[in-house]
């Protein structure tokens, strides 16, 4: 039995691998890792594939300095800027996505956090939406406090999104206007408020494979439910506009390792899919069991109809 199969069997027997073991796996053959990750997904998660969509509920003018982000005031980009969308626009989008076969819908807003007034506004929208549509509600409104997160829960939100973005060690290389600890504090408060949590990051920022593995282990310690992994799509005008893109092999290895580290969780293919020549099909054979469909915040995505067709052809149930 080779090393990949040895660790696969360890996971299938109910144990978890250590960081040292994950680092060993990171040096192994990509195809073997991907195949084993797919076996783990099939054995522990089954054929269910979770599909979500997002709407950019408030765009641009963000005071944070995340180097990858087109919405930051620190960078000159061509993105559209607007205040919080009206409830009718959000509700119409959610119902449309639900009718297209999407399971989850999230309103994502720019900025470190939304204001108290905006919390009240979105909660009212979520309450209205809950009465009109059965789609599961997610929210991504920045570094909210416990009381604000409780209000979201009471208005019908099931899952809160707050990405770690990268490892604790690498975080200050991409952002200095807020901290890694502020993010983990928000995640812990969301869990305390009774919300599920969606948290992952971006790969291709200049981090090492060890950074990605460290992030995965932090997410495991936090016990988040869904792990969205974005592939950096360098945007002109941002600090990372000339960042070298990762190879598909490197991307595949990363996704497979996340399945080894987080065997029972939703490993979600997120932004950057448009960079992949197969729309992420290879990754869906390498441990992925969830995806964000449709357009991302500031970049184009994959149409939901095309996603569902591909996902079903791969043997998943949507």
Swiss-Prot record:
Residues engaged in binding [2Fe-2S] cluster? 106, 138, 198, 268
Is Ribonucleoprotein there in the keyword field?
no
* SMART domains reported for this sequence: BATS, Elp3
Alphabetical list of InterPro entries matching this protein: Aldolase_TIM, BATS_dom, Biotin_synth/BioAB, Biotin_synthase, Elp3/MiaA/NifB-like_rSAM, rSAM
Q: Any note on cofactor binding? A: Binds 1 [4Fe-4S] cluster. The cluster is coordinated with 3 cysteines and an exchangeable S-adenosyl-L-methionine.
Entry annotated with the keyword Iron-sulfur: yes
Record key words, sorted: 2Fe-2S, 4Fe-4S, Biotin biosynthesis, Iron, Iron-sulfur, Metal-binding, S-adenosyl-L-methionine, Transferase
- State what this protein does: Catalyzes the conversion of dethiobiotin (DTB) to biotin by the insertion of a sulfur atom into dethiobiotin via a radical-based mechanism.
Q: Which HAMAP family match?
A: BioB
Q: How does it assemble?
A: Homodimer.
Protein name as it appears in the record:
Biotin synthase
Source organism per entry reads: Clostridium botulinum (strain Eklund 17B / Type B)
């Amino acid at each position: 039995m080779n090393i990949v199969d040895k660790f696969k069997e360890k996971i299938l027997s109910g144990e978890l691998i250590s960081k040292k073991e994950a680092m060993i796996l990171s040096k192994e053959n990509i195809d073997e890792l991907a195949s084993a990750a797919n076996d783990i997904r099939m054995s522990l998660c089954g054929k269910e594939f979770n599909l979500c969509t997002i709407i950019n509920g408030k765009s641009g003018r963000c005071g944070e300095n995340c180097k990858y982000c087109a919405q930051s005031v620190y960078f000159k980009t061509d993105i559209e800027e607007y205040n919080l969308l009206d409830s009718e626009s959000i509700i119409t989008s959610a119902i449309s996505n639900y009718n297209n076969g999407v399971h989850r819908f999230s309103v994502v807003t720019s900025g470190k956090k939304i204001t108290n007034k905006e919390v009240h506004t979105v909660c009212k929208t979520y309450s209205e939406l809950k009465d009109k549509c059965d789609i599961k509600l997610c929210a991504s409104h920045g570094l909210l406090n416990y009381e604000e997160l409780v209000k979201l829960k009471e208005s019908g939100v099931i899952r809160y999104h707050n990405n770690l973005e990268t490892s604790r060690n690498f975080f200050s290389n991409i952002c200095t206007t807020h901290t890694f600890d502020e993010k983990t504090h928000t995640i812990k408060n969301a869990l305390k408020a009774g919300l599920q949590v969606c948290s992952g990051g971006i790969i291709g920022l200049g981090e090492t494979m060890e950074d990605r593995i460290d992030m995965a282990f932090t997410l495991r310690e936090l016990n988040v439910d869904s792990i969205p992994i974005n592939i950096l799509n360098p945007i002109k005008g941002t600090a990372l506009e000339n960042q070298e893109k990762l190879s598909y092999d490197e991307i595949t290895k990363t996704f497979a390792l996340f399945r080894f580290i987080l065997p029972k969780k939703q490993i979600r293919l997120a932004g950057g899919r448009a960079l992949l020549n197969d729309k992420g099909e290879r990754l869906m054979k390498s441990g992925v069991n969830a995806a964000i469909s449709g357009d991302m915040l500031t970049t184009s995505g994959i149409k939901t109809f095309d996603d569902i067709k591909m996902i079903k052809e791969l043997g998943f149930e949507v």
